[in-house]
Swiss-Prot record:
Pfam families: PPV_E2_C. Gene3D superfamilies: 3.30.70.330. This is Protein E8^E2C. Residues 1-112 are annotated as: Disordered. It comes from Human papillomavirus 4.
Length: 210
């Protein structure tokens, strides 16, 4: 009986050893699977990969630049020149003429158009047509006034005529006297700083020549 038990225990232990030997150990494929299943590291985005976002203000500036380039024309490096146009009847460009020659002084018999002319151009145009003042009054008052102005060394006029009258004019203030000036500025200064005789009227005008 004892022999049977010993034999049975020996066979059981030997079979247990063989089973332990047949158990599969940890294979290398399992380690590879675990390594593959491990989470991979994420790549940090580079500066070149990041998309550049533009603000709406910069987009508006770009659109305005494109519109300006479209209006001025592509490839036009020069800005359009501004032309100054006069307000006269012709509507053409205002060009500053040359200074009048001595023969051209007083050659114009029409009033100068002031629109579209610079100060220098206006003076040059008026030099061809000397401005004048026509005084109307009594003969005695005009003669006395002229005598005082001539003897006072008043140099703010060009010429002063004698007292004259139209033939057939029998009115009370029938006497006339002409005063010529170099420019309208001189004429305006003369009217501003001088008093005319009592009950005397004046008017502006110009002559073809003196």
């Amino acid at each position: 009986m004892k022999l049977k038990i010993l034999l049975h225990s020996s066979t059981y232990s030997s079979s247990f050893d063989t089973e332990e030997q047949q158990l599969p150990g940890p294979s290398t494929s399992y380690s590879e699977v675990t390594e593959q299943a491990s989470p991979t590291r994420r790549r940090k985005p580079r500066k070149s990969d990041a998309t550049s976002t533009t603000s709406p203000e910069t987009e508006g500036v770009r659109l305005r630049r494109r519109r300006r380039e479209g209006k001025s024309g592509p490839g036009s490096g020069e800005t359009p020149r501004k032309r100054r146009r006069g307000g006269g009847r012709g509507g053409g460009e205002t060009e500053l003429g040359s200074a009048p020659s001595p023969a051209e002084v007083g050659s114009r018999h029409r009033q100068v158009e002031r629109q579209g002319l610079s100060r220098l151009g206006l003076l040059q145009a008026e030099a061809r047509d000397p401005p004048m003042i026509l005084l109307k009054g009594t003969a005695n008052s005009l003669k006395c006034w002229r005598y005082r102005k001539v003897n006072s060394n008043c140099c703010n006029f060009l010429f002063m005529s004698t007292v004259w009258n139209w033939v057939g004019d029998c009115s009370h203030n029938h006497s006339r006297m002409l005063i010529a000036f170099d420019s309208t500025d001189q004429r305006d200064a003369f009217v501003k700083h001088n008093l005319f005789p009592k009950l005397c009227t004046y008017t502006y005008g110009s002559l073809n020549s003196l």
